[in-house]
Structure formats: structure tokens, C-alpha cells
Design a protein with these regions (language model features):
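Residue-level signature of catalytic and energy-coupling elements of molecular machines
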Residues: 52, 122, 217
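Mid-length scaffold segments of soluble, non-membrane domains
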Residues: 89-160
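Alpha-helical transmembrane segments and their juxtamembrane interface "caps"
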Residues: 56, 105, 109, 139, ...
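A cross-kingdom marker for long, charged
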Residues: 201-233
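Bacterial N-terminal signal peptides that target proteins for export
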Residues: 1-10, 17
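C-terminal segment of classical bacterial N-terminal signal peptides
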Residues: 15-23
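N-terminal Sec/ER secretory leader and immediately downstream segment
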Residues: 25-98
């Protein structure tokens, strides 16, 4: 029993040590069972995925959260006051709501790809995450899933944004900006803007959950750690 608690404490220290910029108190990760450390980390990160997606993939998950709320594209934002004076304030509000609803609808579709990346995480990946920065796991997921997630989100978001008349106006304006070299072609639609902002919000929330786990791993996932290390003899 004492050995179980000792090994558990080593894992907790390893998970938290990144906040100190490296291995705390000279901890050698080789003192841990690689398989157990990796399994424990994956369980904690699986919980983080569920929490991040669960917070965003619901009504008002984006719209009522200032950290991730998708505001008007910069080109429209600059003209917002004038447009409201011209009587299109309702359309602007509808556009903001629609963009955020599109993001809320897309985020739940990320779970499959994120959990696929989690399954494919190697022991070396796990060690790098344990001793990395406070968002090392989030960066791993971002590198592994950003491109396929963007492809998955885009059509879901497009089905919502294409229903907004002001979105069509934005797209027309953006296309002109491309010809002038102001915008890149891939950024010239409302769909691409919202897709990028949705991904930004998702990874921001995942980083928050990761920091919470690193700060208080036992408080965040005590039952899973007991389960992982309870069988160690």
C-alpha cells in the first residue's frame, strides 16, 4: 500500500512539475512505470477533452463566454458604428449569434478526432507532455488534429453562415479585398473566419482544462489515479 501511494505521488509530481519549468526536485521519469504514467496521463487528458467540448458544444457555449465569443470580422467591426446608424444593427446582431451558434454546433464533432490522437499518443509523447509547458498536451492535440478538424468543422459552419444575408455581403467584400492583396484567399469567406475562431476557442478551452489538471491533478482526477495505481504491486 505504501508503495502504491509513493508511486502515485511521483506521478502527481511529474504531472505538476512543468509549472516549475522542468523536472521538480530532480525527478527522474524513469523511476515511473512508463505504461502506468502514460495510462494515467491519457485518462486525465480524456477527461479534459470531455470537459472542454462539453462547455463549448452547447447553446451559448461560445456566445455567452467572453473568452471564446466570436465577434464580427475585423472588416465589419471597423464599420459597425456606421452600419448601426444606417439601421442594420439587427442584422449585425443576427450575424454574431449565427457565427457562435455555428461554432457550438461544430465543436461536438471534434471528440472523435481528439480521442483518436489521444489513443495514438506514444510513451515519448507522454513524457514530453509531463515535462513540457502548462499547455504541452494542448499543443500536441493542436498539431495532430488542427488540419482534419478544420476540414470537419468547415461544412458544418458553412451550413449556418450561408443562411445569413449579411454573411453574403461580407463574402463579396472579402473577395474584393483578395484582389487588392489585403486578404488571403483562404480567409476570404465568413465560413473560414468562423472555422478558425472555433478552433481557437476549442484549443483555448482545452489549455484551460489542462492547466487545471496540472495545478490540482488529484482534485481533478483522484479516482482515476487511484484506479491506475491501485493495481501496482
Amino acid at each position: 500500500m505504501k508503495l502504491n501511494l509513493f508511486i502515485s505521488s511521483l506521478f502527481v509530481t511529474a504531472l505538476s512539475c512543468s509549472a516549475l519549468g522542468g523536472s521538480a526536485f530532480g525527478l527522474d521519469l524513469s523511476s515511473l512505470s512508463n505504461a502506468d504514467a502514460s495510462a494515467g496521463l491519457k485518462k486525465a487528458l480524456d477527461q479534459g477533452i470531455n470537459l472542454a467540448v462539453g462547455k463549448l458544444g452547447v447553446t451559448d457555449g461560445f456566445l455567452k463566454n467572453p473568452q471564446v465569443k466570436i465577434d464580427l470580422p475585423p472588416k465589419l467591426a471597423k464599420a459597425e458604428s456606421v452600419m448601426r446608424m444606417l439601421g442594420v444593427g439587427d442584422e449585425l446582431d443576427q450575424l454574431v449569434t449565427s457565427m457562435n451558434r455555428a461554432a457550438e454546433a461544430a465543436v461536438p464533432e471534434s471528440k472523435v478526432l481528439l480521442k483518436q490522437a489521444l489513443k495514438q499518443m506514444s510513451l515519448e509523447d507522454a513524457k514530453r507532455i509531463l515535462t513540457g509547458g502548462d499547455d504541452a498536451a494542448t499543443q500536441y492535440f493542436k498539431q495532430a488534429t488542427y488540419v482534419p478538424l478544420k476540414a470537419k468543422f468547415a461544412p458544418i459552419i458553412g451550413r449556418t453562415t450561408e443562411k445569413v444575408k449579411l454573411g453574403e455581403t461580407y463574402d463579396a467584400m472579402a473577395k474584393k479585398a483578395v484582389t487588392l492583396g489585403i486578404l488571403k484567399p483562404e480567409d476570404a469567406t465568413l465560413q473560414s473566419y468562423v472555422t478558425d475562431k472555433t478552433l481557437d476557442g476549442l484549443f483555448l478551452m482545452m489549455a484551460e482544462e489542462e492547466r487545471a489538471i496540472r495545478k490540482d491533478p488529484l482534485g481533478q482526477a483522484s479516482s482515476l489515479l487511484k484506479k491506475v495505481f491501485g493495481a501496482v504491486h
